[in-house]
Amino acid sequence: MEYRQLGKSGLRVSKLCIGTMVGFTNENYEEAKKIVETGIDYGINFIDTADCYGESEEIIGRILKETGKRNKVILATKFGWYMGDGPNDYGGSIKHIIEACEASLRRLKTDYIDLYIIHVVDPNTPMEETLYALDKLVRDGKIRYIGTSKHPSYLILEGIFISEKYGWARFVSEQPPYNLLDRSIENELIPMALRYGIGITPFFPLAAGLLSGKYRKGVKLEEGRMKWRIEKMDPIVEKSLEVIEKLIVLAENRGVNLAEFSLSWLMNMQGVSSVILGARKIEYLLSGIKACDIKLTEEEMKKVDEIVPPGSYVYPYYEESIWRPARMFYSSKARKIKGTGAYIPDNKTGSDKKAGYEE
C-alpha cells in the first residue's frame, strides 16, 4: 500500500480510505467488521465517517475496540450537519462543535479524533468562531488535525488566513466529490490545494454508483441509489451513460472493470492524498484494493481526457454538493428522515422527495 502526505502536515495516509456512509449498521455488523479488518490487513490506515451517518460512528468504535486496532488507523469524522431539530443542533458554532465532538468521541469509543472535518458550509457562522472552537479542541487533545468537506476554495483560503493570523490550527484537507463524470475541481480547487498545502480526499469516486459498471443503456437495472434517476432518464443521466460506455471500452482494453479503472484514474490525479471508497460489501473493498496496484499509462490518461476533458463535468456533483446544503442551512428547523435517525432541513426540495426523504 502506498502512503501519502495529507496536505501540509506530517500525517501519512493510505491512498485508499474506507468510507462508512452506507453499510456500517448493527444489522450489517459482521460484514462491516470484515471490511475494516481486511482493509487494515492490506495496509489501509484511513477510515472516514461522520456524526450524521446513522450508526456508523458507533459501529466503527465497536470494531476498533474489539479488534484492538485503534492505533493502526487514522480516524476521520465530520460535524456540522443536522443532528436534531433544535436551533443549535447543526452548523459551526462553538456550542455545536464542542458538543458534537464530545458526542463523536463517545460513539467512537476513543479519546481523540485524528482528523475532524467541517462537513458542509455554514453561511450563518463566522469562520473565526468555527476555527476558534477547532483550535481549542486541538489544544485540549480531543482532535489532532482539521479539514473541510464540500467547501469552495475561497472559504478554505479564508480559513487558512485566519489560522495564520491567530496562530490557530489550519486546514490540512478538503473532501470534495471528484470522479470521471465531474472533473470541475481541477479548475480552481486543486490548483489552490497544491499551492496552499491542502490534501484532496475525494468522495463519490464512482459517482454514486454510476461508475460501478452496473448502470448501462439497455441493461436491466439493479437496486441502487441511482436507479430512480436512470429510470427517469433525464438529459444529464443520458449523457452520463453515453460517456460510461466509452470509459468501459478503455477499462476492458486494460483488462479491468470500470470501477477499478475509475479508482485507479483518480488515485493517479495530482493533489489527491486518498480516495474515499464507500464499501458496504467486502468485494467492493477488494476491488478498490486491486485498483491501488493499477497504474494507467500516459496514453490511457490521454484517452480519458478526450472523453471527459480536464476541468469539465457531465454530472455536476461538485456544484450540487457545495451550494445545496449551504442554502438549506438558512432554514432554522429540521425534520427526521422516515425510517432513520437522521435529520434534514424542513425546506425540502423536489430532489429530496424523489430520493425518499419523506416525513
Model features per residue range: what roles?
Residues I185-E223, N257:
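Aromatic-lined glycan-binding groove of carbohydrate-active enzymes
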Residues L11-L16, G43-N45, K69-V73, T110-D114, ...:
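Short, well-ordered coil/turn segments that N-cap beta-strands
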Residues E37, D41, G84-S184, E188, ...:
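Glycine/proline-rich, positively charged
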Residues M1-V73, R139, G356-E359:
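N-terminal binding-site loop/beta-alpha segment at the start of enzyme catalytic domains
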Residues M21-G23, A50-C52, K78-Y82, I118-V121, ...:
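Active-site beta-loop-alpha junctions enriched in small/polar residues
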Residues G7-F24, A76-D89, Y112, I117:
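N-terminal small/glycine-rich loop or linker at the start of catalytic domains
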Residues E223-V249, N253, G271-V272, L286-E359:
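Terminal-tail/helix-coil boundary detector
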